[in-house]
């Protein structure tokens, strides 16, 4: 039996739906239209199966719910009953899995379905036990056991609430009472009355029995009314004929009635199945169109299909809703927050979208960070809800009583809540409420509340999760906005620090520094008061500068003494401590400290030290009087940096004041010195006219030091002038006396220079002669060296000649030996040739004998005779060749002997040549020795000539120097003579110059 290839995945896919997995519309595209094909099949019939005592409708391949995504078309002409029964059984098994009813054995169920299929038409007959095809039943059982589960569906898993059974207890809830996220369903009601099978059996029995009973009664009555004929055979024949005719008529009527009933029932069944198939085929497009069917199993199946379609629609709607929610959260996480002012608009937009997806009438977001004066309240309402929540009373809890977990109220009328809470809910017409808290460091920051104002609502886990995710995403968005705000504030604070530093730098004294700092810091921090608190020697302090907002008490001039400050806080503040107090009443301060701050309405403060040249000068304090304040770290850092700038500005102002005082003192000192300098110039003015007897008045200031130094200088100058006058007189006298002697000395120097020049010329001539001798000696030495080299080369050539002759002698001796060996070898060849000749003679003799023997043999030995002749011819040729070889050997021996003799004669000549070469080499050695002696002598002569030339040159140079010295002396003598003349004129001029100085 052929099995539908798309039916092996139905039970597990249906079980996936029962387990709550999300299915999209693609899973329903595999619904087949086989029921439409059944409408054309002549074998289509209504069949029923009984499962555990309950009648289940057989809907055929039209309920092929969960295939692998491909539509399967089955031609009704080709589909057999086994395929139809198999498909129907799997469909019912899928329905049973979907409704989560107790499991039914697949083989037993298919067997019953097969029985019902095979007995659908025969049920009209009286036979209650039709035959069962056991082979087909076994095949069906095997096909049911071998069903394989489908592969897993790669879809996102969404946690769903437990599903209600689809049939027979499944119900569709009123859509008006459901939120877009609700998945509750209502089972269809089961129709009363008999099943289709019982109806068909009852009608078939009635149609079959009533006509038969009527006809039988008529026959019986007719038989009873028949007259008794005379002849029994005629009566019997007549009665038999009538009964037979009546039976035939009854059977014909029964057959016609049964055929009519069967045709009508099959038509109705096929009509319902066709409608169900069309609905199942188009269920993924027309899930919301109900189908009206009669109130039996088909009607129940129709209601089941409607319920399942509604649930699938709910699942699809839920999946779309989850996708939109995810898109909303993603859009919120990617919101562009270029400015902190945009945050409320972004939250408002996303709350409107979230409320539409959530299906509630009101969605309220309340956010109030710690120590912030105002809270953020954002509301999203539908068009039917009237009245916004007051931003001053946005929720029914106090700030400290806000819930720490999700609070879900399905019905406010019956919820166990406090009276204020109930009153608040009734005031705002809240019927159901879901609240998600927002915390940071265990401190409640806000709430996200969803309200149903029309009717109570059962909050599902999915709704709680979405609202919690939305709350977390809103918190993330607010954190991003806070980071942007902190970044902008940091940039603003940097600009404030820059501007304030420039303003403080422009202050010329400490009062201006403190005034500017207090005013600008209060505006920068948006504080209510900023004061400068300065210490005295006992570490008690006074408020010397104050900048305070309107409406708060003034602290300027207040004196505050803290007896514990010197022991506990001086070193801490000196090292740069900055103390930030969010709330003075919850900071652990002593009652004394709180009492000092309370008159000024201080709720929070920020304290930083003012250090001046390493000493603690005072404190810069910022007060928040409107309420507690959570000082941010960037504000604390800015406050500390500004305090440092105040200290630097104080140092700068002190330096400026000191600089001004120094400038005044320097100006007064300069004016005084200028006056004394003028007096000094007037006192020493006679010195410029040559009066060295004047003395300046000495005082105790710097000018007095200059006057004293000036007096000492004038005194030294007076002594020098006196000495110059004396020296000039003496010099004049000396110059007059030595002028004649210097003139004579110049003349003698000139004569000496001429004599030296003449001697120098003679020395130069002798030097040239010595250089010529040295050059000739050098040339002779070069010639001797070349001769020595030539002799050495000749000696080397003689040595090589001797070596060559010796080698020739050895070669000739070796050649002679080889030639002798060649002669001996030729003698051996001669012996061999003689031996070969004897062999040839013997061969010739043997050949002759063989020829004779062949002749004796006659015809038989003729061939052997020819061979013998050939052998004898060869022997003769061998003898001739042997004779020629012997002659050649003899010739070789003779020539060898001649060569040996020539070699011996050459050897003797080589020996004689060797002796001659040895004698020549000894002569060359003697020549070499003589050349070496000559070379030594020439070298000595050359050295002596060179030495004489050098000595002569040195003497020449010395004489040249002497000549130069003589010339120089002559010129210097002339110069000295001229100088003496000039000195005489200078001495006379000096005497005239020093006469104008008054030294006594």
From Swiss-Prot:
Cysteine disulfide partners in this protein: none
Gene Ontology terms for molecular function: transmembrane signaling receptor activity
SUPFAM superfamilies: GAF domain-like, Methyl-accepting chemotaxis protein (MCP) signaling domain
Entry superkingdom: Bacteria
Keywords, ordered alphabetically: Repeat, Transducer
Gene Ontology biological process terms in this record: chemotaxis; signal transduction
Family label: Belongs to the methyl-accepting chemotaxis (MCP) protein family.
Protein name: Putative methyl-accepting chemotaxis protein sll0041
């Amino acid at each position: 039996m052929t099995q539908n290839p798309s039916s092996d995945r139905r039970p597990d896919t249906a079980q996936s739906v029962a387990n709550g997995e999300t299915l999209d519309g693609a899973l329903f595209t595999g619904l087949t239209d086989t029921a439409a094909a059944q409408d054309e099949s002549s074998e289509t019939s209504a069949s029923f199966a009984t499962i555990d005592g309950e009648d289940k409708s057989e809907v055929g391949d039209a309920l092929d719910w969960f295939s692998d995504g491909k539509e399967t078309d089955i031609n009704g002409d080709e589909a057999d009953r086994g395929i139809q029964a198999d498909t129907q059984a799997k469909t019912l098994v899928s329905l049973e899995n979907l409704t989560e009813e107790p499991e039914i054995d697949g083989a037993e169920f298919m067997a019953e379905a097969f029985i019902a299929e095979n007995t659908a038409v025969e049920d009209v007959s009286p036979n209650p036990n039709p035959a069962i095809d056991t082979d087909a039943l076994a095949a069906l059982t095997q096909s049911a056991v071998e069903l394989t589960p489908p592969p897993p569906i790669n879809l996102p898993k969404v946690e769903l609430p437990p599903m209600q059974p689809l049939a027979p207890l499944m119900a569709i809830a009123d859509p008006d009472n459901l939120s877009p996220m609700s998945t509750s369903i209502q089972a269809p009601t089961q129709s009363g009355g008999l099943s289709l099978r019982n109806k068909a059996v009852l009608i078939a029995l009635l149609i079959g029995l009533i006509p038969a009973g009527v006809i039988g009664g008529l026959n019986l009555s007719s038989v009873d009314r028949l007259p008794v004929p005379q002849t029994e055979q005629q009566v019997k024949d007549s009665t038999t004929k009538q009964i037979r005719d009546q039976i035939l008529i009854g059977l014909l009527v029964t057959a016609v009635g049964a055929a009519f009933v069967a045709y009508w029932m099959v038509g109705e069944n096929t009509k319902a199945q066709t409608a169900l198939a069309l609905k199942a085929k188009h269920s993924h497009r027309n899930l919301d169109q109900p189908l009206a069917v009669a109130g039996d199993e088909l009607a129940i199946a129709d209601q089941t299909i409607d319920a399942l379609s509604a649930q699938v629609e709910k699942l699809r709607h839920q999946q779309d809703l989850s996708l939109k929610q995810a898109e909303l959260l993603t859009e919120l996480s990617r919101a562009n927050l270029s400015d902190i002012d945009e945050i409320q608009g972004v939250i408002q937009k996303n709350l409107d979208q979230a409320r539409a997806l959530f299906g509630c009438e009101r969605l309220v977001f309340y956010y109030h960070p710690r120590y912030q004066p105002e809270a953020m309240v954002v509301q999203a309402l539908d068009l039917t809800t009237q009245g916004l929540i007051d931003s001053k009373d946005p929720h029914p809890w106090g700030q400290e009583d806000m819930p720490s977990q999700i609070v879900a109220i399905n019905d406010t009328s019956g919820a166990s809540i406090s009276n204020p809470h109930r009153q608040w809910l009734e005031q705002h017409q809240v019927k159901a409420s879901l609240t998600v808290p927002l915390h940071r460091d265990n401190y409640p920051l806000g709430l996200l509340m969803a309200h149903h104002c029309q009717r109570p609502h059962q909050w599902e886990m999915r709704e709680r999760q979405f609202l919690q995710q939305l709350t977390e995403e809103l918190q993330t968005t607010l954190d991003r906005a806070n980071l942007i705000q902190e970044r902008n504030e940091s940039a603003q604070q940097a600009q404030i620090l820059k501007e304030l530093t420039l303003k403080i730098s422009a202050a010329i004294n400490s009062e201006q520094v403190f005034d500017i700092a207090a005013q600008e810091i209060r505006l920068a921090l948006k504080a209510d008061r900023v004061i400068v608190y300065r210490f005295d020697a006992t570490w008690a302090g006074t408020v010397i500068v104050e900048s305070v907002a309107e409406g708060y008490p003034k602290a300027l001039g207040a004196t505050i003494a803290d007896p514990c400050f010197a022991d506990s806080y001086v070193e801490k503040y000196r090292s740069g401590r900055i103390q930030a107090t969010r709330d003075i009443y919850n900071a652990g301060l002593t009652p004394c400290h709180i009492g000092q701050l309370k008159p000024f309405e201080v709720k929070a403060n920020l304290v930083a030290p003012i250090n001046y040249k390493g000493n603690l000068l005072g404190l810069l304090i910022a007060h928040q009087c409107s309420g507690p304040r959570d000082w941010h770290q960037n504000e604390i850092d800015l406050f500390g940096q500004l305090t440092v700038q105040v200290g630097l500005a104080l140092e700068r102002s002190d330096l400026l004041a000191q600089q001004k005082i120094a400038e005044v003192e320097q100006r007064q000192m300069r004016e005084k010195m200028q006056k004394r300098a003028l007096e000094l110039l007037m006192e020493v003015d006679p010195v410029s006219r040559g009066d060295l007897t004047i003395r300046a008045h000495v005082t105790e200031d710097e000018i007095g030091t200059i006057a004293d130094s000036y007096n000492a200088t004038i005194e030294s100058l007076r002594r020098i002038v006196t000495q110059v006058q004396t020296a000039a007189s003496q010099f004049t006298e000396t110059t007059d006396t030595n002028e004649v002697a210097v003139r004579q000395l110049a003349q003698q120097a000139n004569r000496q220079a001429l004599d030296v020049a003449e001697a120098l010329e003679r020395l130069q001539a002798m030097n040239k002669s010595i250089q010529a001798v040295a050059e000739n000696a050098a040339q002779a030495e070069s010639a001797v060296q070349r001769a020595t080299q030539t002799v050495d080369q000749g000696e080397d050539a003689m040595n090589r000649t001797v070596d060559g002759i010796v080698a020739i002698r050895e070669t000739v001796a070796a050649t002679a030996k080889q030639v002798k060996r060649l002669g001996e070898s030729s003698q051996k060849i001669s012996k061999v040739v003689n031996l070969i000749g004897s062999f040839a003679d013997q061969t010739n003799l043997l050949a002759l004998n063989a020829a004779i023997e062949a002749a004796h043999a006659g015809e038989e030995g003729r061939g052997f005779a020819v061979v013998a002749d050939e052998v004898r011819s060869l022997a003769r040729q061998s003898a001739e060749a042997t004779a020629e070889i012997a002659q050649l050997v003899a010739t070789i021996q003779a020539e060898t002997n001649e060569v040996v003799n020539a070699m011996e004669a050459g050897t003797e000549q080589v020996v004689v040549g060797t002796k001659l070469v040895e004698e020549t080499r000894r002569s060359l050695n003697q020549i070499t020795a003589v050349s070496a002696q000559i070379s030594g002598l020439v070298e000595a002569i050359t050295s002596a000539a060179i030495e004489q030339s050098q000595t002569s040159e040195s003497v020449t140079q010395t004489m040249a120097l002497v000549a130069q010295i003589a010339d120089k002396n002559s010129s210097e003598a002339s110069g000295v003579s001229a100088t003496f003349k000039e000195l005489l004129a200078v001495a006379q001029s000096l005497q005239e110059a020093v006469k104008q100085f008054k030294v006594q």
